[in-house]
Design a protein with these regions (language model features):
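Conserved activation segment of eukaryotic-like protein kinases, specifically the C-terminal portion
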Residues: 54-68
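A conserved short helix/loop substructure at the end of the activation segment
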Residues: 163-174
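Conserved end of the kinase activation segment
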Residues: 68-78
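Catalytic-loop of the protein kinase fold
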Residues: 15-30
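Protein kinase catalytic-loop region centered on the HRD/HxD motif
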Residues: 6-18
């Protein structure tokens, strides 16, 4: 988790900065030493200004931030924060063969309606083990089922990274600092 966060932080803090725009598990490779490396920069976008917003839809549906599901999306580095949270969720759910992805089985129109118009999003639902992913209204997903398997600070971090409003998500620098603190605390 920390390697992924450090990789995205590196991209986001360069001058000019880079938004990866397609952070997903299949774009994370693990070296023979167990270090995670981010790959596939085919959709990456150089962001010239810290105040500018990007205006094109890109990425892979299951990892896309809600702000991308609008007719004329405006977004910044926080789309990578949201996607990174989805990768973390996959890591946390690795043991579960029944996990379902947020928009599995939905076409683009249905996704746009759910996320853009109705402001719905994926949530982890602790009421059922067999179906861990369901749809529920904002603002915060329930991740209480994961709290039994993972330290609460990690689950809290993923919840913050998943916020519907990008301004409520941490930066990747903040994510790195929190993960470094947790590594020191739990080692």
């Amino acid at each position: 988790m920390l390697d992924i966060a450090r990789g995205l932080e590196y991209l986001h803090t360069r001058k000019p900065s880079v938004i990866h725009r397609d952070c997903k598990s299949s774009n994370i490779l693990i070296t023979s030493r167990g270090v995670a490396k981010i790959t596939d920069f085919g959709l990456a976008k150089v962001k010239e200004s810290t105040r500018s917003m990007v205006r094109s839809v890109v990425g892979t549906v299951n990892w896309q931030a809600p702000e991308l599901w609008h007719p004329h999306p405006k977004y910044n580095h926080k789309v990578d924060v949201f996607s990174c949270a989805m990768v973390y969720w996959e890591i946390m759910q690795w043991h579960n063969p029944n996990k379902k992805y947020p928009w599995e089985g939905m076409n683009e129109h249905a996704i746009y309606d759910a996320v853009g118009a109705k402001k719905q999003r994926c949530v982890l639902n602790h009421h059922t083990i067999d179906r861990l992913l369901s749809y529920a209204p904002l603002p915060r997903p329930s991740v209480s089922g994961l709290r039994k398997l993972w330290c609460p600070e990690i689950v809290d971090l993923v919840e913050r990274m998943w916020q519907h409003d990008p301004q409520d998500r941490p930066t990747m620098t903040e994510v790195v600092h929190e993960l470094e603190h947790l590594v020191r605390r739990y080692r």
